[in-house]
A protein has these predicted regions:
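Short acidic/His/Gly/Ser-rich catalytic and metal-binding motifs that mark active-site loops
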Residues: 110
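Amphipathic alpha-helices of TPR/Sel1-like and other helical repeat/solenoid scaffolds
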Residues: 136-139
Length: 289
């Protein structure tokens, strides 16, 4: 049977899809490789629809995910969502399904598995991916697996799923997650949510977050007297990254007090009283003014 499969691969025969249902997992994997890697486009739908087989190898699963991504229609976005929530599938494959949904609206010209240049043709609706992510949210929202949570944040942000704002805030508040994951949640929230919710998230991060979260919060802090006070506090600290974030935040503040603070930083730069690590940040700040 392997000989027949390899012959079909060489001839690029769509009948190779029959091996996707073989009892020998090695043959199933080789058929999936042939359909995706050659590629044998006439059999791509057969590969994409292999989502009910729980015994697939990781290489086969990666190609199933890729087939659904490449076909690019609503039903295939939904199948990626189904893979993402299927707990019988390895977490890294579920993450890959979410990443595919995140990339749905702006696919790379290279194949996700082989890296070969193979640009996708035809219209792809980001709304299809948005609906798939929204359908998957209830089963992925419990933060049990941090890599899935991170991938879900990326997908939510990419498809602009505004209804996930409350979940993003809850993710930010979850101190069992890594700073990186919580920081990503804050960034996504800042780009999706209404200002009141963003302000609540920023205030939480500034008051109770780690230095990394505080730096991220400074980036999204709304213009106010309190925000300028937070910027000054960060500039007086010893955390270089925090100071850089404060300078970047200062660029968005158009008040006279912010202008005065910019002038003070420039004076420190000229008189060499400013840390060399901040010189470029201050120069860029002045140029933006």
């Amino acid at each position: 049977r392997m000989g027949a499969l390899l012959a079909m691969r060489r001839l690029e025969r769509p009948e190779i899809a029959q091996f996707l249902h073989d009892e020998d997992s090695l043959l199933v994997t080789e058929a999936a490789r042939a359909i995706n890697d050659v590629p044998i486009q006439a059999a791509t739908r057969d590969l994409a629809n292999l989502t009910d087989d729980k015994n697939l190898s990781e290489p086969a699963w990666r190609r199933v995910v890729n087939a659904n991504f490449r076909l690019g229609r609503e039903e295939y976005a939904q199948q990626l969502g189904a893979i993402a929530v299927n707990e019988s599938i390895e977490a890294n494959i579920r993450v890959e399904a979410l990443q595919a949904l995140a990339d749905w609206g702006s696919p790379s010209g290279r194949d996700r598995v082989t890296g070969i240049w193979s640009p996708l043709a035809g219209y792809r609706s980001i709304e299809d991916a948005r609906r798939a992510v929204q359908s998957a949210m209830p089963q992925l929202a419990d933060h049990r697996f941090q890599n899935l949570t991170s991938a879900l944040i990326d997908a939510v942000q990419a498809v602009k799923l505004e209804t996930a704002s409350a979940w993003l805030l809850g993710t930010l508040r979850n101190d069992e997650l890594s700073d990186s994951t919580r920081s990503d949640a804050l960034e996504a929230l800042a780009q999706l949510a209404e200002s009141a919710l963003v302000n609540e998230a920023v205030q939480f991060a500034l008051e109770k977050g780690s230095k990394k979260l505080q730096r991220e919060a400074l980036r999204w802090q709304a213009q106010s007297a309190d925000s300028l006070q937070a910027i000054k506090f960060a500039l007086e600290g010893e955390d270089i990254q925090g100071q850089q974030a404060a300078i970047a935040s200062l660029a968005r503040d158009t008040t006279q007090e912010a202008m005065d603070l910019t002038g003070k930083l420039m004076t420190q730069l000229v008189s060499e009283e400013l840390s060399g690590a901040l010189s470029l940040d201050v120069i860029e700040l002045v140029e933006e003014r």
